[in-house]
Amino acid sequence: MVQLWKLVLLCGLLAGTSESLLDIRGNDVLRRLISGLERGLGTFDSTIEIIFQNLKTELESRCLNDVVEETQQTENSLEGLISRIFQVVNRLTGVRIRNVQVPDITFEATSENSADVSIPITADVTVSLPLLGEIVKLDLNVDLQTSVSIETDAETGDSRVVVGECPNNPESISLTVLHRRPGLLNDVVDFGVNLVRQLVSSVVQHELCPRIRELLESLDTECIKKLIGEPQVTTQQEI
């Protein structure tokens, strides 16, 4: 038997009176996500932690070389990690984010001991609603930005890796509508887009940025120096 609230939602969508019902639905989805993020998504899928540890090991091993050679392996490992994270997000929220790609990871030297780090992420997103099924498909682009530097203690002479903030700016998340269910009101499509924006923003803030920070902080100063490379105006060091 179809639940009453689903029938009410469907009638509201068709009649154009569903704004408050969509808000309730969206808030429920976000509550489930935040609850999962607070627990840690790794508690829902132990593979996340395994992939993350393998990513750290892979990057550390590359730093054993005199020069960190450009390779797609790190990007592939990071894609696997993010894909697994979004699989858990799908289980919690019903929003499907797949075909994750990390084209490159760049370290743009700002001095001999510091660099801006850029990690672009692309993915396909599908938003569904009860009874209606898929309402909108989106193209997702996220540009994670942070910085890394090597600081030396004036008294002890010891050096340490310092990772900057990973700002969760709305401008860093771009969504493009690829397909929408015919006949739907614009308000319903806007609901889907805004829901994804809030969802991805929460994942970036509570899951992706902390893991990028932990990854960089796990590397020693010599490895970071190799990744930074020489400061140049027009050249980026890719990993």
UniProtKB/Swiss-Prot annotation:
Top-level taxonomic group: Eukaryota
InterPro entries: Bactericidal_perm-incr_a/b_dom, BPI_fold-antibacterial, Lipid-bd_serum_glycop_N
Disulfide links within the chain: 166-209
Gene3D superfamilies the record matches: Bactericidal permeability-increasing protein, domain 1
Keyword Plastid: no
UniProt family annotation: Belongs to the BPI/LBP/Plunc superfamily. Plunc family.
Name of the featured protein: Short palate, lung and nasal epithelium carcinoma-associated protein 2A
